[in-house]
A protein has these predicted regions:
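Metal-dependent amide/peptide-bond hydrolase catalytic core
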Residues: 1, 42, 161-165, 172, ...
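Acidic/His- and Gly-rich active-site-bordering loop/insert found
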Residues: 1-91, 114-118
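Glycine-/small-residue-rich active-site loops that bind phosphorylated ligands and cofactors
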Residues: 16-18, 90, 97, 129-132
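Beta-strand secondary-structure signal
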Residues: 50, 122, 179-183
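Short, solvent-exposed loop/turn segments at the edges of secondary structure
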Residues: 78, 151, 175-179
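Glycine/serine-rich anion-binding loops at beta->alpha junctions
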Residues: 88-104
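Acidic/histidine-rich catalytic neighborhood of metal-dependent amide-processing enzymes
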Residues: 99-173
Length: 183
């Protein structure tokens, strides 16, 4: 399976927050094939996946597999989970935030000779970032990693950031969201 096919397969999984719905089942074998050890760290109805390879300072890719609800499907110009390619663009719920980032990082790892790695590389994914984010990465998993002397030293989050166009901005320490209604 190539990068595009994998991304489409991941996007077709209807992982509406806080449910993973099988995304980790798709991702985990790919990581194991690269030599990563993996661990599911679940709290209540939230699934989390932690994978690592190597030793030393820990560089972690942080992400989430959940997506926000689609809203009325008839408001979409296409099926939000079809992940169809039109004019070289994959359109699907989660394409920008953030299943494509997960695919890109995973496939970048396939191009690295991990046997020459001098640090620990880890991946930490949660199924509950778009919702209340309880029982996921920040609230529980990072605490568990610290308690096991497995702190993260460096982190890359594949969250989209932008001012004018998707991906035109890199941000440091951004977390959270705001939702509301105007009446």
């Amino acid at each position: 399976m190539n990068l595009i096919e994998f991304t489409q397969k991941l996007l077709r999984i209807q992982s509406i927050t806080p449910r993973d719905m099988g995304c980790f089942d798709l991702i985990e074998p790919e990581l194991k094939e690269l030599g990563f050890s993996t661990k599911r760290i679940n709290y209540l109805n939230v699934e989390n996946l932690y994978a690592e390879i190597g030793s030393g300072e820990n560089f972690c890719f942080l992400g989430h597999t959940d997506v926000v609800p689609t809203g009325p499907v008839e408001s979409w110009s296409c099926d939000p989970f079809a992940a169809e390619i039109k004019e070289n663009v994959i359109t699907a719920r989660g394409a920008a935030d953030m299943k494509s980032s997960i695919s890109a990082f995973l496939f970048a790892l396939k191009d690295i000779d991990l046997s020459k790695n001098r640090k620990k590389i880890s991946i930490l994914l949660t199924s509950n970032e778009e919702g209340d984010a309880k029982d996921g990465t920040i609230e529980k998993v990072l605490d568990e990693l610290k308690q096991n002397n497995n702190a993260i030293n460096y982190c890359l989050a594949g969250e989209p950031s932008s001012k004018n166009e998707l991906g035109d901005t890199v941000r440091i320490g951004r977390r959270g969201s705001l939702s509301g209604s105007l009446t």
